[in-house]
Amino acid sequence: MELKLLNEQGQPASTLDASDVLFAREYNEALVHQVVTAYLANARSGNRAQKGRSEIAKSTRKPFRQKGTGNARAGMASSPLWRGGGKIFPNSPDENFSQKVNRKMYRAGVAAILSQLAREDRLAVVDNFSVEAPKTRLLAEKLKGMGLDSVLVITDGLDENLFLSSRNLHKVLVLDVHETDPVSLVRFPKVLVTKGALAKMEEAWQ
């Protein structure tokens, strides 16, 4: 599979031969959906909580006698049927949302996303991508000069200047190649990969 190699101005300078295993895989929408959904589910912290009838701070005294009042019978004010009562099936803070995805499926899903990005001309390779200092303005000007607005940049190792420069740009995300995830790949309309990062990706998928 041939990928575009861009220059500093964002113009195609040449092409680069890339691994077919990583960039020529058929797109499997069901697999990609499963991988992305599982990744998002595994990131959930499970911090929501509700109270059941046994946890409500109300008296357990019977509100009124069983018969003769004309009301429906009631045992206690914390009943889920009453206003202010407990919830019948409360959410628990230790609820487990994790979904299991086999390593082979995960790798196939990521490869399918990368292949689709390459086919849609949304993925390109750059020799090097860096800024001289940790300044948001420098990175914003660099991306504007390349005609890029919303972009995911995948680098070979963490470039501190580049990472710090990107933090105030809400449509820009800089990731080390080892931190690349399927959600980030599908979220951005454009993906830039450095040559060093591409080599590490191909090595990992051999």
UniProtKB/Swiss-Prot annotation:
Gene3D superfamilies: 3.40.1370.10
Gene Ontology CC annotations of this record: ribonucleoprotein complex; ribosome
Gene, per the UniProt record: rplD
Any one GO BP annotation for this protein: translation
GO molecular function, one term: rRNA binding
Keywords, sorted A to Z: Ribonucleoprotein, Ribosomal protein, RNA-binding, rRNA-binding
Function: One of the primary rRNA binding proteins, this protein initially binds near the 5'-end of the 23S rRNA. It is important during the early stages of 50S assembly. It makes multiple contacts with different domains of the 23S rRNA in the assembled 50S subunit and ribosome.
Official protein name in the record: Large ribosomal subunit protein uL4
UniProt similarity note: Belongs to the universal ribosomal protein uL4 family.
Matches recorded under HAMAP family: Ribosomal_uL4_B (MF_01328_B)
InterPro entries: Ribosomal_uL4, Ribosomal_uL4-like, Ribosomal_uL4_dom_sf
Region (Disordered): 47-94
Subunit structure of this chain's protein: Part of the 50S ribosomal subunit.
